[in-house]
């Protein structure tokens, strides 16, 4: 039966990832549990929520090989509260899993290992590797515009697709569009799948982990599943959304009549300040643009009003340039602008306008492989 010795700090992070995968209100006991498998000097932790399956391996001192399943939440809550020290985990059979730490001991009920689902196999139609840094970049640049409307299920994830040597991620909620891509080292089969929001968020946490961020991630694609293998010790298999993502190229404006170039941080900070006055029912800020100034204003029902003026400047920290003699007043949901401005770290941002009702194209000169489109609102 399973018996192993492990450092608390080694176990706590893996349990954090596992707990994040497991649904908080899972009514099926097997899916609320985590499977612990001790073998060959490693502890494998397996967790699932039926739509995605996470397997992690960490180095431990295996005294006796074996496996068992226990409540993910309970085990995670216990380990997080323990001081840094050695833990001994022992499967005692009918009396459960014993967790022995410094001056403390816990016994957790277990379920039969046979009731825990195994990770499905995948027959990949395409596979490739990219750096975790690049993968994190395209997911972070697009995840915020995923639709939360469950009736539009084909928009409830990020559209991962390969076209020639470009690996792209795109998402839209009907009001905004986010596209980010990286160039692969070699050309592979063109492909397109919709990764659910939950799966995108979970794999993003893993690739951003300090021990993985400088590694590569292998991606295996099939028509209904995707598998990620990171650092050889972590793999995640996810179901895909069965739907067709819209041809987003038709939403990207091809021309514009005016252009705003502005310091990204200054612009983001100003919008965030003015947005405080707005209310959830109708969130809108108005941008009034001219060659000399940008005025950002808002009126909040039962709150008041706010205004901030940015003057034309060529200084790096306060750069503002509007290239049209025709003034423009246009409204936006401030959250949509804030999300874009926070997604890409760049000194300046460019906004391309056609008229007050047309979608606005947003680009970052230092990050040419990120494109955003935001619909304006009436103000």
From Swiss-Prot:
<dbReference type="GO" id="GO:0008408">
    <property type="term" value="F:3'-5' exonuclease activity"/>
</dbReference>
<comment type="similarity">
    <text>Belongs to the beta sliding clamp family.</text>
</comment>
<keyword id="KW-0808">Transferase</keyword>
<dbReference type="GO" id="GO:0006271">
    <property type="term" value="P:DNA strand elongation involved in DNA replication"/>
</dbReference>
<dbReference type="GO" id="GO:0003677">
    <property type="term" value="F:DNA binding"/>
</dbReference>
<dbReference type="InterPro" id="IPR046938">
    <property type="entry name" value="DNA_clamp_sf"/>
</dbReference>
<dbReference type="GO" id="GO:0005737">
    <property type="term" value="C:cytoplasm"/>
</dbReference>
<dbReference type="GO" id="GO:0003887">
    <property type="term" value="F:DNA-directed DNA polymerase activity"/>
</dbReference>
<keyword id="KW-0963">Cytoplasm</keyword>
<keyword id="KW-0548">Nucleotidyltransferase</keyword>
<comment type="function">
    <text>Confers DNA tethering and processivity to DNA polymerases and other proteins. Acts as a clamp, forming a ring around DNA (a reaction catalyzed by the clamp-loading complex) which diffuses in an ATP-independent manner freely and bidirectionally along dsDNA. Initially characterized for its ability to contact the catalytic subunit of DNA polymerase III (Pol III), a complex, multichain enzyme responsible for most of the replicative synthesis in bacteria; Pol III exhibits 3'-5' exonuclease proofreading activity.</text>
</comment>
<dbReference type="Pfam" id="PF00712">
    <property type="entry name" value="DNA_pol3_beta"/>
</dbReference>
<keyword id="KW-0239">DNA-directed DNA polymerase</keyword>
<comment type="subunit">
    <text>Forms a ring-shaped head-to-tail homodimer around DNA which binds and tethers DNA polymerases and other proteins to the DNA. The DNA replisome complex has a single clamp-loading complex (3 tau and 1 each of delta, delta', psi and chi subunits) which binds 3 Pol III cores (1 core on the leading strand and 2 on the lagging strand) each with a beta sliding clamp dimer. Additional proteins in the replisome are other copies of gamma, psi and chi, Ssb, DNA helicase and RNA primase.</text>
</comment>
<dbReference type="InterPro" id="IPR022637">
    <property type="entry name" value="DNA_polIII_beta_cen"/>
</dbReference>
<dbReference type="Pfam" id="PF02768">
    <property type="entry name" value="DNA_pol3_beta_3"/>
</dbReference>
<protein>
    <recommendedName>
        <fullName>Beta sliding clamp</fullName>
    </recommendedName>
</protein>
<dbReference type="GO" id="GO:0009360">
    <property type="term" value="C:DNA polymerase III complex"/>
</dbReference>
<keyword id="KW-0235">DNA replication</keyword>
<dbReference type="InterPro" id="IPR001001">
    <property type="entry name" value="DNA_polIII_beta"/>
</dbReference>
<dbReference type="InterPro" id="IPR022635">
    <property type="entry name" value="DNA_polIII_beta_C"/>
</dbReference>
<dbReference type="InterPro" id="IPR022634">
    <property type="entry name" value="DNA_polIII_beta_N"/>
</dbReference>
<keyword id="KW-0238">DNA-binding</keyword>
<dbReference type="Pfam" id="PF02767">
    <property type="entry name" value="DNA_pol3_beta_2"/>
</dbReference>
